[in-house]
UniProtKB/Swiss-Prot annotation:
One of its GO terms (cellular component) is cytosol. It comes from the Bacteria. This is UPF0246 protein YaaA. Belongs to the UPF0246 family. One of its GO terms (biological process) is response to hydroperoxide.
Length: 258
């Protein structure tokens, strides 16, 4: 079973590390090509392209400039500990045991605009390059064209290595669009998280993102290997709703706190 999640815009390169083990990203040659393209952009161009403030554009121009192909624990940190958005608040990887990291390294993948696919312990230098950004490159007009089948092929390798054919899609639509489902040697299961608001259940972005992290943690902590085991997920008040679910979609609901 292979879990897919999105990266985060918020990064943490200060907190103490909970493991010293690390691996290197497998697609760095591709990352280097994107860095070459990104370095051509001025801070105002970055601001427009990414729809971010001038201050953030300056920070990211500096990140592109400072990026180097030799990754060490001094200039990079493990991806699962560097990302700090809502998904990662739910995941809480900073509390993982070494055995948890082992299981995650085999069964969890983070999709990335710059790195393509990251394993949890892959070192990562700081960046911001969302998958949906239209960064022109030698392979096309955006990052989807740049990555082509590369991400899908890398996921197929991971599936073959663990000897099964199930992908748990906990990534956002923007990131999962970089995967080619018809070329993926897997059954795709998509958990959906609905929160009650004024008597109606709907996807509330902040809660849904955190729930994706909670579900990832649930799978890792319990060493789950079969999709039917996901229905036992009950973190922070969520419960499985069989009637709303279908073959490829598992629906979890949570009542509004009154």
């Amino acid at each position: 079973m292979l879990i897919l999640i999105s990266p985060a815009k918020t990064l943490d390169y200060q907190s103490p590390l909970t493991t010293t083990r690390y691996t290197l990203p497998e697609l760095l040659d591709n990352s280097q090509q994107l860095i070459h393209e990104a370095r051509k952009l001025t801070p105002p161009q970055i601001s427009t392209l990414m729809r971010i403030s001038d201050k953030l554009a300056g920070i990211n121009a500096a990140r592109f400039h400072d990026w180097q192909p030799d990754f060490t624990p001094e200039n990079a940190r493990q991806a699962i500990l560097a990302f700090k958005g809502d998904v990662y608040t739910g995941l809480q990887a900073e509390t993982f045991s070494e055995d948890d990291f082992d299981f995650a390294q085999q069964h969890l993948r983070m999709l990335s605009g710059l790195y393509g696919v990251l394993r949890p312990l892959d070192l990562m230098q700081p960046y911001r390059l969302e998958m949906g950004i239209r960064l022109e490159n030698a392979r096309g007009k955006d990052l989807y064209q740049f990555w082509g089948d590369i991400i899908t092929n890398k996921l197929n390798e991971a599936l073959a290595a663990q000897g099964d054919n199930v992908v748990i899609n906990l990534a956002s639509d923007e990131y999962f669009k970089s995967v080619k489902p018809k070329k993926l040697n897997a059954e795709i299961i998509k958990p959906v998280f609905l929160d009650e608001k004024n008597g109606k259940f709907k996807i509330i972005s902040f809660y849904a993102k955190k729930a994706r992290g909670l579900m990832s943690r649930f799978i890792i902590e319990n060493r789950l290997t079969k999709p039917e085991q996901l229905t036992g997920f009950n973190s922070e008040g969520y419960f499985f709703d069989e009637d709303s679910s279908s073959n490829g979609e598992l629906v979890f609901k949570r009542y509004e706190q009154r």
